[in-house]
């Protein structure tokens, strides 16, 4: 196998036994693909499919005027270039978006002839569309945001029942619901009396037959649609019916049934069974004589006209009187409906009988009354309303997904229509659709068919970014359409153009609202690369059109069998959102309809193939799926007699020939975060959930450290998260420094006529959304060869292209003087000294100068009543220097605000007018460092309103940026020149000259001659070979173009910097100061492992006091052994043992290197590690001796191991590895107390565990207050750190003081420390004077209470006891 640049340097030993059939897919594809499909930006307008933006325009246009004389048609849209790039947008606080222009055609027709009179085409600006960055995020108002995908109920038809909860009798009531993509919902439901009702949009219910009548059906037709008929013959005073024996099965015989000879087949009172049916068929019975009583309560199927003209209506219940009328009326034959009590209920007929509407008009009026209560119905209004509800493509759309689900559920064939027309027809309901739904509902009530499971993933679909943006865009366009329709009638008379007609504001507003404030547009979680990826792969059931936390029951939140391989059963938040917010599984993807699919290998006749097929939950029904670890021989045949499989949502065992599919990978079930937990299979599910959630909260440490025990997914996550710099093309590293990498591209990957140079600029010390530090570090060296896709620089929390969220710590499971009580963690001071768990946090502090009523605020160093010392860190403009170390209370930006004018005497006014003295009427409103913060200023940005003069600092910053940019461009051009020179020398070497430059005609061009010349001279040489001359010309042209392009880039940058910034109204200047704060680990910080084993640091001990082993090696962390058994997360113990083996092997390699062993010995030892302990085999022979030495050097800190989820290392393998590292197979070590040197009673489990520092730091939570702000009404201190509030001394705390009898303490708590306004002012004054006397007064809350009682109309007064 070929190793990549980083893999060669550090191979991770993999314990996986199962073959890799397919690699994990690109993890952000659900976001990136969805938005790319929505925009279709790369496609030419003619080739755009009818989806996304194109579909939104097509569905609203053409817009016709009310008269039909003018229309607007959509031609095409185009997206421009965004004004600023992503980094500039983040800096400026603007949105990364592209301007959209739409070509619109205005057609004006002649009023009389309707022929086209005039056509005008024009491009119209339609606002800006936010663009997605390459990592699947959006920059909105300068912050990175993610649009979370939504899991909602798929459009279509669903059949359900109430589980007997609605009616007191416990009777199960069935219902059907047609859910469109947009439009009104249509529900059919049974009530306790077995009548069928209909609801439109969940309003008051109507009898279902009202809708059927409104569709234009009469009684007979309705009965015909739902029932079969049974002919009844009247012959010689007795009745006969046509006999279909099968229909009688299950009924009670109400009379003896005899054959033609009179032999009794079924006696009266017996139940007719299958044997009786067969006997009747054998006897050839076709008619059956029935007594009159048998026909009572039966229902007539159609209108029956008697001899005297009287009509017995269809749907009449037969009774003795009716039968007599029929006999007297000379009716020889009539039809009744075939109904029974077993599987042919007379529900629709009963409903029809209860329905009071007589014809279509009355039915329409009934529906109108329900939909528009209180409005007087007219025939036209009722007709229009009903048609618009379900039969108008403007108001109702089932969508292709809905139609597919609808037809599938009703057992019809389904092909998706491609053209606009067929889509519209399929999008609305037909009469047959409504009747089929009602028919299916009745059949389910009759006991045929099943109700649907609404939590099945075949009935829930994913709406991703693209689709949601499209819907929002359509909403905006529909608003535009209304406005345009009004004005189209004037288009002809006023000679308007499309630009005059269309106002794009509603579209821009709809898009802005969606990206800025939708529930699903979220502030990106940017703690570390994993949290970014997880956020983008999140699937939420909440949001517009989804569920709400309060209404969501237990079933929706629960794990469903269809989640397997689609949605992770582990990763979901704890708390009120549990089960409503999920994470996609590693291999899952959404198909074109939005249903989640997961890949399986096909199995044919018991043989597993390498064909991979993606199945959605709908297609999975009926398949038989084997586990990924089923035993297979070398030809791929399943070897077990009975294979463990999943079938119809159950785990069963089946013979191999019945198996249809097999899992692709053991990790298929879980999400990305869960797949990073080694030995997940040994952890309790609740702890695994905490583990996967806490990995997302890990703060990037100063020096990332790869996990010794990983799962093999680390590299995928680091690469796909986009925090690393990845080579676009292969080549050689030409130049490298801390902020730039330059690659000379390989010849075969170059495009004709380019210099073949790729330049990568790195991100240095920028702030993330969570205030952590984003920084990229180079991992390549000058002259290294890299291939496309290799990692060039690590980002935050990545180490050599692998995700590295924490640090490998030497842990011991033992108690230590109560310092690990209740999951507390005891740390060694060594961790602090080595800065293992130190993180950098960057805070952004802003100072805004506004235009106030009294005059403009000013940013200046001239601040009243502030000493020199306080201004020492500010420059002349009043802004802090970069590099200044500041502490709480220091001034960062000096700012003065005009004070209210005081009454001045005429003399003062005169002096003011003459000398312009203004110092007295401004107050200091500078930006200061908040309490509890200290750090270093690493950057300052100044934004000035357009049209205002920039101050010195702003100009200096601008100049520095321009200089740096010019330097970049110069270097870029220099690199291009160098590359071009080398290519020219390569081309000319060995050629013959035709003169030109310093050469003569016929000169042989040697390398020595050429290398002494400058590029300008080289390009003047004219070679004899014309092809080479042509290529030299190409290079010359290319260099000219590059030079012009670079000049243009510089001019553009200069223009951008020179123009003022768009600031919100009333803001003149904004100064942003970035503070870097270094946070070491300290008691009170929260730490965790990857198995849900979290704890708070309780103490940091000197190294010499920590327990140590016989060699004197101290442990880093002491954990409580009692945290393991009850929590059942044994994975952490296995990780500890395996980590110990990994470190032991590293130590052995280091020893070999120190002893300068031969490369051959190193190879042998590495071969033992990688290829003799089981797991995946590594091809070490493909590495050169230098590469082996480099590999060994990188393994000294420990050999990284991968134990994939559900396919990890076995106990025996861990023991073998421990043995190979010369460590006891038990994994336990004798430890000694560092303080006394005494041995502990028994051996202790010691090993290496990967520990994370979580973003719950004590520095952010620690808070103290003496005085501060008070609440307006109660005059009590505010609460919370953000408000600089106090600690609430509540009811129970008061009880405690009462119980102790601490009267004076209690008094000061309830008065001067809380809401006794005068008392607290007095005591403050007293304390300042050094007099600690307290004089409590009346608490303000007493006054509030008296006022409240008065507001109830009870007069209450306080009488002082004077």
Curated annotation (Swiss-Prot):
GO molecular function, one term: DNA-directed RNA polymerase activity
Reaction it catalyzes: RNA(n) + a ribonucleoside 5'-triphosphate = RNA(n+1) + diphosphate
TM segment ranges: none
Keywords in alphabetical order: DNA-directed RNA polymerase, Nucleotidyltransferase, Transcription, Transferase
Alphabetized InterPro entries for the sequence: DNA-dir_RNA_pol_bsu_ext_1_sf, DNA-dir_RNA_pol_bsu_external_1, DNA-dir_RNA_pol_su2, DNA-dir_RNAP_su2_dom, DNA-dir_RNAP_su2_hyb_sf, RNA_pol_bsu_bac, RNA_pol_bsu_CS, RNA_pol_bsu_protrusion
Record EC number: 2.7.7.6
Superkingdom, natural source: Bacteria
Biological process terms in GO annotation: DNA-templated transcription
Any single GO CC term annotated in Swiss-Prot or TrEMBL for this entry: DNA-directed RNA polymerase complex
The family this protein is said to belong to: Belongs to the RNA polymerase beta chain family.
Protein task: DNA-dependent RNA polymerase catalyzes the transcription of DNA into RNA using the four ribonucleoside triphosphates as substrates.
Quaternary structure and interacting proteins, as annotated: The RNAP catalytic core consists of 2 alpha, 1 beta, 1 beta' and 1 omega subunit. When a sigma factor is associated with the core the holoenzyme is formed, which can initiate transcription.
HAMAP family associated with the record: RNApol_bact_RpoB
Name of the protein: DNA-directed RNA polymerase subunit beta
Phylogenetic classification of the source organism: Bacteria, Pseudomonadati, Pseudomonadota, Gammaproteobacteria, Moraxellales
């Amino acid at each position: 196998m070929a190793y990549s640049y980083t893999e060669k340097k550090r191979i991770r030993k993999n314990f996986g036994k199962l073959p890799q059939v397919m690699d994990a897919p690109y993890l952000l594809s659900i976001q990136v693909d969805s938005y790319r499909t929505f925009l279709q930006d790369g496609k030419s307008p003619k080739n755009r499919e009818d989806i996304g933006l194109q579909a939104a325009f097509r569905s609203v246009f053409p817009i016709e005027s009310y008269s039909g004389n003018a229309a607007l048609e959509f031609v095409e849209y185009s997206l421009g270039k965004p004004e600023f790039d992503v980094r500039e947008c983040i800096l400026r606080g603007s949105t990364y978006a592209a301007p959209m222009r739409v070509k619109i055609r205005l057609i004006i027709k002649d009023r009389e002839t309707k022929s086209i009179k005039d056509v005008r085409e024009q491009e119209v600006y339609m606002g800006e569309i936010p663009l997605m960055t390459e990592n699947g995020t959006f920059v909105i108002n300068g912050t990175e945001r993610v649009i979370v995908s939504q899991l909602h109920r798929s459009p279509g038809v669903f059949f359900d029942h109430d589980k007997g909860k609605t009616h007191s009798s416990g009777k199960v009531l069935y219902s059907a619901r047609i859910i469109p993509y947009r439009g009104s919902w249509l529900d059919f439901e049974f009530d306790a009396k077995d009548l069928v009702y209909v609801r439109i949009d969940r309003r008051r219910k109507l009898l279902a037959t009202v809708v059927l009548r409104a569709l234009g059906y009469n009684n007979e037709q309705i009965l015909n649609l739902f029932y079969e008929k049974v002919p009844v013959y009247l012959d010689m005073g007795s009745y006969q019916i046509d006999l279909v024996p099968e229909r009688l099965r299950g009924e009670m015989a109400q009379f003896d049934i005899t054959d033609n000879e009179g032999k009794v087949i079924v006696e009266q009172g017996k139940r007719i069974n299958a044997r009786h049916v067969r006997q009747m068929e054998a006897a050839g019975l076709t008619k059956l004589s029935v007594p009159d009583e048998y026909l009572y309560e039966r229902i007539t199927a159609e209108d029956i006209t008697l001899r005297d003209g009287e009509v017995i209506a269809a749907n009449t219940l037969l009774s003795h009187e009716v039968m007599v009328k029929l006999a007297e009326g000379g009716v020889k034959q009539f039809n009744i409906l075939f109904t029974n009590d077993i599987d042919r209920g007379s529900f629709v007929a009963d409903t029809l009988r209860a329905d009071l509407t007589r014809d279509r008009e009355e039915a329409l009026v009934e529906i109108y009354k329900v939909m528009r209560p209180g409005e007087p119905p007219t025939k036209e209004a009722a007709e229009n309303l009903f048609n618009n509800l379900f039969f108008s493509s403007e108001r109702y759309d089932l969508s292709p997904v809905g139609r597919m689900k609808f037809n599938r559920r009703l057992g019809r064939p389904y092909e998706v229509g491609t053209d606009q027309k067929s889509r519209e027809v399929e999008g609305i309901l037909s009469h047959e659709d409504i009747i089929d739904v009602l028919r299916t509902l009745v059949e389910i009530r009759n006991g045929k068919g099943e109700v649907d499971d609404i939590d099945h993933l075949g009935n829930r679909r994913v709406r991703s970014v693209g689709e949601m943006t499209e819907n929002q865009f359509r909403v905006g366009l529909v608003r535009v359409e209304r406005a345009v329709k009004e004005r189209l009638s004037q288009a002809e008379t006023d000679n308007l153009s499309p630009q005059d007609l269309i106002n794009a504001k509603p579209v821009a507003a709809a898009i802005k609202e969606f990206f800025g404030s939708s529930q699903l547009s979220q502030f990106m979680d940017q703690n570390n690369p994993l949290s970014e990826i997880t956020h983008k792969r999140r699937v939420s059931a909440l949001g517009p059109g989804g569920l709400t936390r309060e209404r969501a029951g237990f079933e929706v939140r629960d794990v469903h069998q269809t989640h397997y391989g689609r949605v992770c059963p582990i990763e979901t938040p704890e708390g009120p959102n549990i089960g409503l917010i999920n994470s996609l599984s590693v291999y899952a993807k959404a198909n074109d309809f939005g249903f989640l699919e997961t890949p399986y290998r096909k199995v044919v006749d018991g043989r597993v193939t390498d064909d991979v097929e993606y199945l959605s939950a709908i297609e999975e029904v009926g398949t038989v799926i084997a586990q990924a670890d089923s035993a297979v021989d070398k030809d791929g045949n399943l070897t077990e007699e009975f294979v463990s499989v999943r079938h119809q949502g159950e785990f069963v065992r089946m013979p191999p020939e019945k198996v249809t599919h097999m899992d692709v990978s053991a990790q298929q079930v879980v999400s990305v975060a869960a797949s990073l937990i080694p030995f997940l299979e040994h952890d309790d599910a609740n702890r695994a959930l905490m583990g996967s959630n806490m990995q997302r909260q890990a703060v990037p440490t100063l020096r990332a450290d790869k996990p010794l025990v990983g799962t093999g997914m680390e590299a995928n996550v680091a690469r796909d998260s986009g925090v690393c710099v990845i080579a676009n093309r292969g080549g050689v590293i030409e130049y490298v420094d801390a902020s730039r990498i330059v690659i000379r591209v390989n010849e075969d990957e170059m495009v004709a006529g380019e210099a073949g140079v790729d330049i990568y600029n790195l991100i240095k010390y920028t702030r993330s959304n969570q205030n952590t530090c984003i920084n990229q570090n180079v991992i390549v060296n000058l002259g290294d060869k890299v291939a496309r896709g290799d990692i060039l620089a690590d980002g935050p929390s990545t180490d050599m292209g692998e995700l590295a969220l924490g640090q490998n710590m030497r842990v011991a499971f033992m108690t230590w003087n109560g310092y690990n009580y209740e999951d507390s963690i005891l740390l060694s001071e060594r961790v602090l000294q080595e800065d293992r768990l130190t993180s950098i946090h960057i805070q952004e502090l802003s100072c805004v100068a506004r235009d106030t009523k009294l005059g403009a605020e000013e940013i200046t160093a001239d601040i009243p009543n502030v000493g020199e010392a306080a201004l020492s860190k500010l420059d002349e403009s009043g802004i802090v220097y970069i590099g200044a170390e500041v502490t709480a209370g220091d001034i960062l930006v000096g700012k003065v605000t005009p004070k209210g004018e005081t009454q001045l005497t005429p003399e003062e006014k005169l002096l003011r007018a003459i000398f312009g003295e203004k110092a007295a009427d401004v107050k200091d409103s500078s930006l200061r460092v908040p309490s509890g913060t200290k750090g270093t200023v690493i950057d300052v940005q100044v934004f000035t309103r357009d049209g205002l003069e920039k101050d010195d600092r702003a100009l200096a910053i601008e100049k520095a940026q321009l200089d740096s940019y010019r330097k970049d461009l110069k270097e870029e051009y220099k690199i291009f020149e160098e590359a071009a020179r080398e290519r020219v020398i390569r081309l000319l070497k060995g050629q013959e000259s035709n003169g030109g430059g310093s050469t003569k005609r016929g000169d042989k061009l040697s390398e020595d001659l050429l290398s002494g010349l400058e590029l300008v001279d080289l390009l003047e040489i004219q070679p004899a070979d014309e092809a080479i001359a042509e290529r030299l010309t190409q290079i010359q042209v290319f260099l000219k173009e590059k030079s012009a392009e670079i000049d243009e880039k510089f001019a553009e940058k200069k223009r951008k910097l020179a123009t003022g910034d768009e600031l919100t109204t009333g803001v003149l200047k904004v100064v942003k100061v970035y503070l870097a704060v270094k946070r070491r680990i300290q008691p009170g910080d929260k730490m965790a492992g990857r198995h849900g084993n979290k704890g708070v640091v309780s103490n940091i001990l000197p190294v010499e006091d920590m327990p140590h082993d016989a060699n004197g090696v101290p442990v880093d962390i002491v954990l409580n052994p009692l945290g393991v058994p009850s929590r059942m997360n044994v994975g952490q113990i296995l990780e500890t043992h395996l980590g110990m083996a990994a470190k032991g092997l590293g130590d052995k390699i280091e020893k070999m290197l120190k002893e300068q062993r031969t490369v051959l010995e190193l190879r042998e030892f590495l071969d033992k590690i990688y290829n003799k302990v089981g797991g995946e085999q590594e091809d070490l022979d493909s590495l050169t001796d230098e590469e082996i030495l480099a590999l060994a050097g990188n393994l000294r800190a420990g050999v990284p191991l991968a134990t994939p989820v559900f396919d990890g290392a076995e106990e025996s393998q861990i023991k073998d590895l421990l043995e190979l590292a010369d460590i006891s197979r038990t994994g336990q070590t004798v430890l000694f107390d560092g303080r006394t040197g005494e041995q502990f009673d028994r051996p202790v489990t010691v090993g290496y565990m990967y520990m994370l520092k979580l973003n719950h730091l004590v520095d952010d939570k620690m808070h103290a207050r003496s005085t501060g702000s008070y609440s307006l009404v109660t005059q009590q201190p505010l609460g919370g750190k953000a408000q600089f509030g106090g600690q609430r001394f509540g009811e129970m705390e008061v009880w405690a003081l009462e119980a102790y009898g601490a009267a004076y303490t209690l008094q000061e708590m309830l008065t001067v420390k809380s809401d006794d306004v005068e008392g607290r002012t007095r005591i403050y004054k007293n304390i300042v004077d050094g007099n600690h006397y307290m004089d409590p007064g009346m608490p303000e809350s007493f006054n509030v209470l008296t006022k409240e009682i008065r507001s109830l109309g009870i007069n209450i007064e306080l009488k002082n006891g004077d």
